[in-house]
A protein has these predicted regions:
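Extreme N-terminal tail/first-helix region
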Residues: 1-20
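Short, charged, low-complexity loops and linkers
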Residues: 1-4, 25, 92-98
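Generic, ordered loop/turn and secondary-structure boundary motif
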Residues: 8, 34, 85, 96, ...
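Amphipathic alpha-helix face/heptad-repeat signature
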Residues: 8-11, 106, 142
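Short, contiguous alpha-helical
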Residues: 24-80, 116, 120-156
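Acidic/histidine-rich alpha-helical segments that form the ligand environment
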Residues: 74-125
Length: 156
């Protein structure tokens, strides 16, 4: 299995362009998820700051615990500086079943949530991991998240 790519994105539009290129060229997996699963997972996590987060097992409840809030801020800064670490499990409910949606449909849904986020002017829901975030912080985190997961798909 190939190693994941180390990529970065300056915008969500650039990430969508990368996804479109992967869909067009084909890809090799450097991890466990296929294209549709990656797109679906990214769609889910980009929608949560707008629609509210699901209940997750978090080592930190930043709303109730000041120490957890500080730990969440430190973890966020580390991700923004260095990217997402490999091997950290995610909520399995945020990963679509392997063949639950076509690659084209998954990309279309991801594109729609990117457009919705870009135009969004409402309140940002508090993150169960990082606490209160503004839209710019969410965008910065999501750019790292998109790079992390799209990096596991290697263009052919």
């Amino acid at each position: 299995m190939p190693e994941p790519r180390k990529i970065t994105f300056a915008s969500l539009d650039a990430a969508i362009l990368e996804a479109e290129q992967l869909l067009g060229s084909g890809y090799e997996k450097a991890g466990n998820w296929n294209f549709g699963q990656v797109c679906g997972h990214l769609e889910n996590w980009l929608s949560y700051p707008m629609d509210g987060f699901p209940k997750v097992d978090s080592p930190a409840d930043s709303a109730a615990d000041p120490e957890a809030a500080e730990a969440g801020k430190a973890m966020l800064q580390d991700i923004l500086d260095n990217g997402f670490p490999l091997g950290v499990p995610t909520n399995p409910d945020t990963i679509p079943a392997e063949d639950s949606v076509s690659d084209q449909a998954a990309l279309s849904r991801l594109r729609e949530v990117v457009q919705r986020f870009s135009a969004y002017e409402g309140e940002i829901a508090d993150s169960p991991f990082f606490g209160v975030m503004d839209k710019q912080a969410v965008l910065s985190l999501q750019l790292r998240h998109f790079a992390h997961h799209l990096g596991f798909l290697i263009p052919k």
